[in-house]
Regions:
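A short, structure-level motif marking secondary-structure boundaries and short turns
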Residues: 60-62, 100-101, 121, 152-154, ...
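N-terminal helical cap/lid subdomain that shapes the substrate entry/recognition surface
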Residues: 2-110
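Generic low-complexity, intrinsically disordered sequence content enriched
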Residues: 12, 30, 61, 123, ...
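Asp-based, Mg2+/Mn2+-dependent phosphohydrolase catalytic module
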Residues: 1-7, 20, 113, 117, ...
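Secondary-structure boundary motif
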Residues: 35, 81, 104, 118-121, ...
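Structured helix-beta-strand junction loops
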Residues: 53, 121-122
């Protein structure tokens, strides 16, 4: 088994449980903003619409088709419209509240804290994330995992975003390690895995849903605890 000198991690959907935290936040806001009084038929419909719209916007962002500001301004405007809210003028206030409260949630993916406890004494750990600068740091602080990481690299700080090799090269420059001595762990085949591979970095694809794919990965896991046998 190859030995590594440093480990890079994605944050959302790999360590920080975005789906659970988003649902928790949206459930609170759905009630606070009285969305059923505004024409939404159910919270489940609202949540499913959000997930679809959010996935579409982040996919477009990752492909370089839109900027982060478009996500901020369009996400809940679209959700409101598609769930039957006639007056969408409150969507920006809803969005601002969501962005403020979401990062305060603390849910991590199963076994995330345990594997960080295991890896932290053995490797310098670094986060590499495309998320908003202010929200990503708040997520890490709220979840109580900041002390595990020597570096937290956001796309804003690096001046480039995954899957560009430049963000990985920036991260390696901060750590002082070479690409061949690093490994990237993430859940997204395009941004995390293909991006790291293009930078010459080995990859570990975190695939808890066991999705079928044809991508080339160095290793693949379905549970974070499997990292113990690889690192």
């Amino acid at each position: 088994m190859k030995s590594y000198a440093c480990v890079l991690f994605d944050l959302d959907h790999t360590l920080w449980d975005y789906e659970a935290n988003a649902e928790e936040t949206l459930r609170e806001l759905y009630s606070r903003y009285r969305m059923e009084d505004r024409g939404v038929t159910s919270f489940r419909y609202f949540l499913e619409t959000f997930r679809r719209v959010n996935l579409d916007l982040w996919d477009r962002y990752d492909r370089g088709l839109i900027g982060q500001e478009v996500i901020r301004t369009e996400r809940f405007d679209r959700v409101f419209r598609e769930t039957g809210v006639e007056d969408t003028r409150g969507s920006m206030d809803f969005s601002a509240t969501y962005l403020r409260e979401l990062p305060q949630k603390k849910n991590l993916l199963p076994q995330a804290r345990e594997i960080l406890d295991y890896l932290h004494p053995r490797y310098p750990l670094t986060i590499v994330t495309n998320g908003f600068e202010e929200t990503q740091f708040a997520k890490i602080e709220s979840a109580g995992i900041g002390h595990y990481f020597a570096h937290i690299i956001t796309s804003q700080r690096a001046g480039s975003k995954k899957p560009s090799p430049k963000i990985f090269e920036f991260a390696l420059a901060q750590t002082g390690h070479r690409a061949q001595d690093a490994v990237m762990i993430g859940d997204n085949l395009q941004t995390d895995i293909a991006g790291a591979a293009d930078a010459g970095i080995d990859t570990i694809f975190y695939n808890p849903g066991r999705s079928i794919h044809q991508a080339t990965v160095t290793h693949e896991i379905t549970h974070l605890q499997e990292l113990r046998s690889l690192l």
